[in-house]
Design a protein with these regions (language model features):
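Hydrophobic secretory-pathway targeting helix
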Residues: 2-70, 228, 235, 241, ...
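Intrinsically disordered terminal tails
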Residues: 17-23, 68-69, 123, 247-263
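Juxtamembrane interface at the cytosolic side of transmembrane helices
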Residues: 34-41, 213-263
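Membrane-helix exit/juxtamembrane interface segments
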Residues: 55-94
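Charged/polar, solvent-exposed surface patches and flexible loops
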Residues: 70-73, 137, 141, 204, ...
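Long, solvent-exposed extracytoplasmic domains/loops
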Residues: 83-197
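Short, aromatic-rich amphipathic segments at membrane interfaces
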Residues: 174-228
Length: 263
């Protein structure tokens, strides 16, 4: 039987191409194996980071819950509650008009974005940022819309005007502490009476409550952010591990070859 012709004449050709193909296959398989291993390692690292973020989110949520319970207990102990009528409308001193005036001061003059859902008649205890700010505005509103009684025991003169001794009713007229003329015989005492140390202390305390409630809301937001990032990274890591898993090699199917029947 004649030998197959090679590229340079009779006889078998050199097995160079076949040998190179086998080597290339081995190298490619090794590269695939190395890359698969790296992907698995990366997937495990991502999964660990995801679990860390989930743990951070859970811890942040737990600590925020503790702060919210503490703030609720503080407000309940002080009996700080908002007033609502039978229709569920916010009132102040029994009047909805007063409450609307306070809200107008809070939203229009101070520019605070009141969250309507925070003003809940079913939960009148002050424990949200909007409720604390409403209480702060209530003190400022009544202070600025009040009238102060000033008693002069002797005549006073200021800027060419003489104020005889007597009792005077001085309207605050919507003025803040810094908007009074403290040297005026009537405005000076009226300022100290209207914007007393008690009013300033209450506003400061309510301001702390507002910041605390706002910080708690940010805490819940951070907890959700950590949990979302953690879940995303965890799923991505597990997906890489699953995608880079070793392929299952199936045994080749065998087929019976019919044998010739001897004569």
């Amino acid at each position: 039987m004649a030998s197959p012709k090679g590229p340079f004449g009779n006889g078998p050709g050199p097995p160079v191409d076949r040998q190179w193909t086998q080597t290339e296959g081995i190298l490619e398989e090794e590269r695939d194996t190395t890359m698969t291993g790296r992907l698995r390692i990366l997937g495990v690292v991502l999964a660990v980071f995801g679990l860390a973020f989930l743990a951070g989110g859970a811890y942040t949520f737990y600590r925020t819950q503790e702060g919210a319970r503490s703030l609720q207990a503080f407000s309940a102990a002080q009996q700080i509650k908002l007033s609502y009528n039978e229709q569920g409308q916010l009132v102040d001193r029994g009047k909805t008009e007063e409450a609307q005036g306070i809200l107008s001061l809070l939203e229009n003059d101070w520019g605070y974005p009141v969250v309507a859902s925070d003003l809940n008649p079913n939960d009148p205890t002050v424990n949200t940022a909007s409720e604390y700010m409403y209480q702060m505005a209530t003190i400022a509103y009544h202070t600025m819309h009040g009238t102060q009684t000033v008693v002069l025991t002797e005549p006073k003169e200021y800027k060419g005007t003489t104020y005889p001794a007597g009792t005077y009713q001085v309207p605050v007229d919507g003025r803040y502490f810094s908007q009074f003329d403290r040297q005026d015989p009537l405005q000076g005492p009226a300022r100290d009476q209207a914007w007393s140390g008690t009013a300033h202390a209450l506003i400061a305390e309510l301001g702390v409550g507002t910041m605390t409630a706002t910080s708690l809301q940010m805490g819940y937001g951070l907890a959700g952010l950590f949990a979302g990032i953690g879940l995303t990274v965890l799923v991505a890591g597990l997906g890489l591990v699953w995608a880079a898993r070793p392929a299952e090699e199936k045994a080749p199917k065998t087929r019976a070859i019919p044998q010739p029947i001897p004569a």
